A protein has these predicted regions:
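Glycine-rich beta-strand-centered segment in the early N-terminal region that forms part
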Residues: 21-36, 45-122, 677
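Mid-domain Rossmann-like dinucleotide-binding core that forms the NAD(H)/NADP(H) cofactor-binding site
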Residues: 116, 123, 146-222
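Beta-strand-loop-alpha-helix segment that lines the small-molecule cofactor/substrate pocket
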Residues: 259-260, 469-513, 719
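Rossmann-fold NAD(P)-binding glycine/threonine-rich loop
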Residues: 268-285, 289, 295, 488-508
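Predominantly a Rossmann-like dinucleotide-binding segment in NAD(P)-dependent oxidoreductases
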Residues: 295-312, 507-508, 515-593, 706
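Contiguous beta-strand/loop segments that form the cofactor/metal-binding neighborhood of enzyme cores
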Residues: 353, 358-372, 377, 564, ...
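C-terminal helix-rich "cap/oligomerization" subdomain common to oxidoreductases
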Residues: 354-361, 368-369, 374-386, 458, ...
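N-terminal Rossmann-like dinucleotide-binding module
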Residues: 376-438
């Protein structure tokens, strides 16, 4: 399918062929008929992308500070590479479209194939021939609402939410400052609600257009005098600021024309240097509106389909969409007069020449249109023929996110005996980009395409944590060797299913516990190779803060941070000691509403009496180095600092080794390739993979028990038994 993409490195907006996305549970596949170009949000993205690195840095000093911290922690070269990897990722543009449902994922009751819908949301309602959209961002369309009107639904909801925040009443006087698309929708919504409306703009053409829609409208120069006449010198009850300008004038003007104790709502991107004197004297209320309404930026609402109770939240973003569509159906919200340009998707780049001013012509509503007669659906884009040359590993990859692009695929690309066959991502876009960048034969949006491809003998699973176990089982059943990024599973039921499959399988599997393969880790292990006493290993992790709403913090999706990432450090200690833990005790600092059991101290015991301690901490400073390992055993001490420096002490003799940070990604893949080529054992024993994963589960459970007297016995505890899992 065709999709408009923004290159964040060079600023070019281009139309590319990408695999058609596939709907997962709670999502619908929509064949798009029309999509609206946002002259505000999308122009801002394009203009940012077009700037050079210095220009980008000036606009985002917060990101510059993060890069400086990362450079101090990890070195300049890895930091620059990480920055370019982020800029290299294409961005999908658009957030408001309309079309027809052509396929449904599971749990989509209330929707049907063939249904006409409006679509909303950045990353979902994008400028592409097909969109995959979650249920709460879909709005059914009445027969008398055309697709081109419905493509305005998302923008209409922004205006609607801003208007609702002002708590309007019938008969109140409402001023709308700024008569762009948002303002022209807002004046119609306010009029439909029974308010007396006046629009204000600096552009006489916008003023004339507003007047043609049935409201009084004036130029900025006449705003104060006209406001007094319009309100009989009382001032406006409500002022909606819909302007798009860095100037502070709209905020200042709003205060001048508002009545005493009026409500002012800003929906546009304007200067917010609020003049205290007049706002204080009039006791004005000021609200900065956030997007489409309640539910916005809440993944449980937008992506997981959980609605808010009507009695508690009357106007969610979804119900705002419905309200906008209803006004369109009743003829009270007109969009046709607002459209100045139509472009077919093939010429979408020309639309951005208009909205960025490269093409000097006035514009307002810019629509992209899509051929409805065309119905060529392809989940696969081919770049080249599959090579007939023999390779030990013919690789298919599931997942094309930042980890794949910045870390694993560069490591894989450097290994000779790996041929890159196919790569998949659910949306298709990132698979297409990564497939072309790294030299895969094809890109797809279908996991099954990769798993069932007879040309592929090895599958790398780099998807969301909750999908790992199921994909591992499917790939093993298909006779593939499997590399899966950690964690292996997010719960004991998944882990038991993987364990059973491994017992009945001839293919090899390994997990992305790369740290044990790092060069300095191998030196550290060699230093203790002949030890005869139990070890004490302390692993301190300055993990850094992650917001509570991040997907990794969700136990059902990411597993939480201890299962999702803490397993790395349990595995490293397991590697050094050479056996899986037999008990785990864990304690967490109080969360205090900021954390989610991610300031944790875990104590692990091992069969030979060794003890491992993992301090996983989210409450530190990210500019400080992330990881430090200290090992005490048999009169020897070793300190590993962030996989950059190893210091060993024995009999008073100190030795220090320094090198560029290397956490072992390439070495692990090389070990896996060698095992496949030679038909040997997996690089990490299965009992350790299972044991480490169980230990991460036990640590989370121990935090819940929070009793210093009771550790979790890894062998006998019912959580890790087959009967409990069943």
């Amino acid at each position: 399918m065709k999709q408009l993409l923004q290159n964040m490195k060079n600023g070019k907006a281009i139309v590319e062929e990408v695999p058609m996305p596939a709907p997962r549970a709670g999502f619908a596949l929509v064949k798009v008929a029309a999509s609206l170009v946002s002259a505000g949000t999308e122009r801002m993205v394009v203009e940012f992308a077009e700037r050079n690195l210095i220009g980008k840095a000036r606009l985002r000093p917060d990101l510059v500070r993060q890069m400086m911290d990362k450079a101090r922690r990890e070195g300049l070269v890895p930091t620059v590479q990480a920055a370019f990897n982020r800029l290299d990722q294409p961005m999908a543009l658009g957030y408001s479209s309309a079309g027809t449902i052509v396929a449904l994922g599971r749990n989509m009751q209330g929707f049907k194939v063939g249904q006409r819908v409006a679509c909303a949301g950045g990353g979902f309602a994008v400028h592409a021939e097909y969109n995959v959209v979650p249920r709460n961002l879909l709005t059914p369309l009445p027969k008398n609402v055309e697709f081109e009107s419905a493509a305005f639904t998302t923008l209409g909801a922004i205006a609607m939410h801003g208007f609702r925040l002002a708590e309007p009443q019938i008969g109140e006087n409402v001023a709308v400052i700024g008569l762009g698309l948002l303002g022209l929708l807002a004046i119609q919504i306010a009029s439909a609600a029974g308010c007396n409306v006046m629009g204000i703009d600096i552009d006489p053409k916008r003023v004339a257009l507003a007047s043609s829609l049935g409201v009084e409208a004036v130029r900025r120069a006449r705003a104060v005098d006209s406001s007094q006449a319009f309100t009989a010198n009382r001032g406006f009850d409500i002022v909606l600021i819909c302007a798009d300008t860095a100037s502070n004038d709209p905020v200042e003007l709003a205060a001048v024309i508002a009545r005493d104790r009026a409500r002012i709502v800003a929906t546009g991107a304007v200067g917010l240097n609020i003049p205290r004197k007049i706002y204080y004297e009039k006791e004005l209320s000021f609200v900065n509106s956030r997007s489409y309404g309640p539910g916005r930026y809440d993944t449980s609402y937008e992506e997981e389909g959980r609605d808010y109770p009507l009695g508690y939240v009357r106007w969610t973003e979804g119900r705002n969409f419905e309200s906008v569509v209803e006004l369109m159906a009743n003829g009270k919200l007109k969009t046709a007069p607002l459209v100045t340009h139509h472009f077919p998707i093939e010429d979408a780049a020309k639309a951005y020449e208009v909205i960025t001013g490269k093409k000097k012509e006035s514009f307002l509503g810019v629509l992209l249109t899509y051929d409805q007669e065309k119905d060529v659906r392809s989940e696969k884009i081919e770049f080249k023929a599959v090579s007939r040359q023999p390779s030990a590993v013919k690789l298919g990859v599931l997942g094309a996110g930042l980890y794949a692009n910045a870390t694993l695929l560069p490591a894989v690309k450097s290994i000779r005996d790996i041929e890159l066959i196919g790569i998949a991502s659910s949306g298709g876009l990132h698979a297409r980009h990564s497939g072309e960048k790294f030299g895969f034969a094809y890109a797809t949006s279908s996991d099954d395409e990769i798993i069932n491809d007879p040309n592929i003998n090895t599958v790398a699973i780099l998807t969301r944590h909750d999908t790992h176990a199921n994909l591992v089982i499917k790939a093993l059943k298909a006779g593939k060797h499997v590399f899966v990024e950690k964690p292996l599973a997010v719960n004991s039921v998944q882990l038991l299913a993987v364990s059973k499959q491994l017992k009945n399988n001839q293919s090899l599997m390994t997990v992305g516990f790369n740290r044990r393969f790092a060069p300095l880790a191998q030196e550290l292990s060699g230093f203790y190779e002949d030890h005869t006493e139990p070890m004490h290993v302390h692993y301190r992790v300055n993990a850094g803060y992650i917001p509570l709403n991040h997907w990794t913090q969700d136990p059902a999706i990411g597993g939480g941070r201890i299962i999702g990432e803490g397993c790395h450090f349990i595995d490293f200690i397991t590697f050094l000691i050479g056996a899986s833990p037999i008990s785990v005790t864990a304690h967490a600092l109080p969360d205090n509403g900021k954390y989610r059991e991610d300031n944790v101290s875990m104590t692990l015991t091992f069969p030979d009496g060794s003890i491992g301690v993992v301090d996983y901490l989210a409450n530190g400073d990210k500019s400080f180095p992330k990881e430090r390992v200290e090992v005490f055993c048999g009169g020897r001490i070793a300190i590993l600092d962030d996989f950059r420096r190893l210091e060993t002490v024995e009999n008073g003799a100190r030795r220090e080794v320094k090198r560029a940070q290397d956490k072992g990604w390439r070495n692990e893949m090389l070990a896996f390739v060698n095992a496949i080529r030679e038909g040997g054992q997996p690089p990490i024993p299965y009992e350790q993979l299972i044991g480490v994963t169980k230990a991460s589960f036990a640590a989370v459970e121990s935090i819940g028990i929070n009793n210093e007297q009771n550790g979790i016995n890894m062998i006998s505890h019912p959580r890790n038994s087959e009967s409990r899992a069943k």
